[in-house]
A protein has these predicted regions:
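Ligand-binding face of N-terminal immunoglobulin V-set domains in extracellular IgSF glycoproteins
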Residues: 79-97
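Aromatic/hydrophobic beta-strand junction motif of beta-rich domains
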Residues: 44-53
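Surface-exposed, glycine-biased beta-strand/turn segments
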Residues: 34-35, 110-223
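N-terminal edge beta-strand
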Residues: 25-43
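Catalytic cores of peptidoglycan-degrading enzymes
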Residues: 168-297
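Beta-strand-rich extracellular modules
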Residues: 99-103
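Short, surface-exposed loop motifs enriched in S/T, G, D/E and P with embedded aromatic residues
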Residues: 67-73, 114
Length: 297
């Protein structure tokens, strides 16, 4: 009977203790960040890539005081964004702050350093019509109005990307006036050259470097006939001094579409194509954008 009693007691204990199923915990969410650029200097574009240990549903990032939109790959683990280093940036170390959030609400945060180095820009001296150095009183209001409009456009960050892949060269001619050169017109210093000039004869067709939406197609006092394309996510192309505008505001254009012809309108010394790029308001070199996005953009 004792043996039976022990057996019953043991059996009771075994059935009284339930089996607890343990769910394996997710490993901590981590992130590794890398960047690619021609150099870390004023006017350069930097592609920043964040690789998370598992898929995330959202990434928030910022650099140089601006929000930096990040886009995911198909598996939501790898996200990337473009950072612009403005011409007037303070030299030294800056951080790209990145915050990723997984579907279950887990977050991973990091600050990726970008050590910006100084760059010397050459000076160009040009002679232009006097009214483009000291504009007459009757056009001052026009200049201010046009400046306010373009500033508002460049400050607008469209939430979706219209562009895809590498950016094309808008004309085949070589670059003749480098980005960032200090400009002296008729002996008077003016703002730096915030674009790149390309050699081309009057009437040469200008191709859209990538897809986007035309947000300005008009004649501006200093820029002449010009076209601004919104590529999305704070990225804009601005083409100036055209002899002909071939698109209208609101047009959706594809990479390679003809947007106009090279000319010599506005403040110029001769026919050429001027291409400015703005990235989240930063003035950046179009050639830097082309280089970064041609390398796995």
């Amino acid at each position: 009977m004792r043996t039976m009693g022990r057996f019953v007691a043991i059996f009771f204990v075994m059935v009284a203790v339930p089996t607890v199923a343990t769910t394996p915990q997710e490993p901590p969410l981590t992130v590794e960040v890398r960047h690619y650029a021609r150099s870390l200097q004023p006017g350069e574009v930097v592609r920043v890539t964040a690789t998370f240990s598992r898929p995330v549903r959202a990434v928030r990032a910022a650099a140089f005081g601006s929000v930096v939109p990040f886009q995911p790959t198909s598996d939501q683990r790898i996200w990337s964004g473009l950072v612009g280093i403005d011409l007037d940036v303070e030299i030294g170390e800056h951080l790209v702050s990145i915050l990723g959030t997984s579907p279950d609400g887990t977050t991973a945060r990091t600050g990726h350093p970008l050590a910006v180095k100084s760059k010397e820009f050459a000076t160009r001296r040009l002679t232009v019509a006097p009214e483009y150095v000291t504009p007459p009183d009757e056009v001052i209001e026009r200049i201010q109005r046009e400046g306010a409009r373009t500033t508002k456009l460049f400050n607008t960050q469209t939430p979706t990307a219209h562009w895809r892949g590498a950016f094309l060269r808008p004309v085949t001619g070589e670059a003749t006036s480098a980005f960032g050169r200090r400009s002296v017109f008729n002996g008077q210093a003016r703002s730096p050259h915030s674009g790149a000039d390309f050699r081309a004869s009057k009437g040469t067709p200008v191709k859209a470097p990538n897809s986007g939406v035309v947000v300005l197609a008009n004649d501006l006092y200093f820029s002449g006939n010009c076209v601004i394309i919104d590529h999305g996510l704070g990225l804009y192309s601005f083409f100036a001094h055209l002899s002909r505008i071939g698109v209208s505001e609101g047009d959706r254009i594809a990479s390679g579409d003809i947007i106009g012809d090279v000319g010599a309108t506005g403040r110029v010394t001769g026919p050429h194509l001027h291409w400015t790029v703005r990235l989240n308001t930063a003035r950046v070199d179009p050639l830097s954008l082309m280089a970064v996005l041609s390398n796995g953009g």
